[in-house]
Amino acid sequence: MREDEGLSPPQYPGDDTRPTSRKELAGWYSYSWAAEVFTVCAMGSFLPITLEQMARDRGVLLSDKVTPCQATWKAPKQLSPHETLSQTLINALRYGRDVPGASQCVVYIFGVEVNTASFAMYTFSVSVLVQAVLIISMSGAADHGTYRKVFLLTFALVGSISTMSFLSVVPKLYLLGALFAIIANTCFGASFVLLNSFLPLLVRYHPSLLRGRNEISRQGAMGDDTWGNTSHDVNNVTTPLLRSAQVDNGTITENAARVSLADTSLELELSTRISSYGIGIGYIGAVLLQIVCILVVISTHQTTFSLRLVLFVIGLWWFVFTIPAALWLRPRPGPPLSCAQDGKQHSWPGYIIHAWKSLGRTVIRTRRLKDIMLFLASWFLLSDGIATVSGTAVLFAKTQLGMQPAALGMINVVAMLAGVFGAFSWSYISRLLNLRASQTIIACIILFELVPLYGLLGFIPAIRDLGFLGLQQPWEMFPLSIVYGLVMGGLSSYCRSFFGELIPPGYEAAFYALYAITDKGSSIFGPAVVGIVTDRYGEIRPAFVFLAILILLPLPLMLLVDVDRGKRDALALSAELEGSQELNAPTYGAVPCNRNDSESAVVQSE
């Protein structure tokens, strides 16, 4: 397809309607390859234990509040000439650390006693809070004007450099390490939201979609020329992959409806394929780097420096593979934000206020959709449980099972492989048992509940006397990581698609934005509560009680969701909003203000 074939006229200054190129897609995939390693290798494995270990190196034993914890860290033996790297890895998986068990340590932060494991959990909670506020606040500026790519590259640069900076953080500066972790996680989350905002545009201007759209338009030209004379709305250009049909004097024309449905089908198919490729490429890169990190940790004798070196490698990977994205990904500017009453361009505070007001409007409308509210409440708890269990498990394995960093890294590899398997197997299981999406999600919740319940078995005296079961031995972490991965694969596959069935047609962008905010903002609470429980009892195991409750709470909420009722309510709200001529918006959780008549006239004339 030629560059100018099927080219839509620009709808605003700077509008880039060129067909999506292979190089542009490669740039989009490149950033997924670059940044996914942070959430998998850093947040999922090495960052929590690095923060805990640096705090431990400056802490004292909980038992006497005097003995330095640094003295309790015994590095594994040096590699002997006759011991291969693979043998060392096997020993790490089998035996954990050389020191049986692990001593609980505390550190004093501004005079407050904090368990070293809690220190890592508190850091994660703060980073999620900052990330959620930043994502909402920047959404207006990111979706309007030329800021999208600039923000993406800026966050990638700051996040990768913050991760690499761990190499210079010595234990006595462990608070600086926490600051770097907060900055890195915040930048990662913000950059991925920006990356995902490119997806609708890559799909909309993809050559295959343009060809299909033109062919459908030609076929319907004899019956109705509405589609051919209707351009994309200015406020709709960065939006939802799903769009409502064109309306003519309040009535959806037959050809417009047919074209819109066909166009939507093509977009959904293409967006699913591109998104799946991006996720797959990101996870392949993460697994490869995770294995490299494990080998680096083993070859450098699993010291605190080993952990800092691994984080440097992760940050370097993030930085280097962002370069192709910087070179190949087009800016794809969004429409200017033209809602200021005085007609002037919005200032930065104006963009921020617009973003929060837009989110508020969507939340208010959500109150009228009972089933969406039930699902989002359930998803809020589920998402919090998923993130909290991951961090808690790694820190529990380190501080109470005494597992070495290499073994902790392998736990994550096993969980990821199980997640990939789960993403495919749950679909087969659902078809085999004729399960609806909601029933599959409920099955995942029940299976997920087994993880904290298994940890609670360690409180039963008879099981505790056995010396195994109930998470008393390092090897028990690996079967549980398989269960966790299977659950993750199922929930990630089904929750988003199930939520899509409840959304008012034509308002997907606003409600999926609310879904994403619920996902990203939920993890503020779980890690903080685990940290408080750990500080109170001096160990992590009692926090399994909280995790069991947190994972169980979504179950009754999900059982209350009525899909048929939710669809009816969504259609009713959509019809009401269409009647009032309100259009869905590109900003995070936005349903934008109406344009004035002069703006509408400009669009129609173009």
UniProtKB/Swiss-Prot annotation:
Annotated keywords: Amino-acid transport, Autophagy, Glycoprotein, Membrane, Transmembrane, Transmembrane helix, Transport, Vacuole
Subcellular location(s) per record: Vacuole membrane
Cystine pairings recorded for this chain: none
Membrane topology, record value: Multi-pass membrane protein
Listed CDD domains: MFS_Atg22_like (cd17483)
Residues bearing attached sugar chains per UniProt: N229, N236, N249, N596
Entry's transmembrane regions: 31-51, 116-136, 150-170, 175-195, 278-298, 309-329, 372-392, 406-426, 441-461, 478-500, 512-534, 543-563
Gene3D superfamilies in UniProt: MFS general substrate transporter like domains
Record's function text: Vacuolar effluxer which mediate the efflux of amino acids resulting from autophagic degradation. The release of autophagic amino acids allows the maintenance of protein synthesis and viability during nitrogen starvation.
Similarity comment: Belongs to the ATG22 family.
Name under which the protein is recorded: Autophagy-related protein 22-1
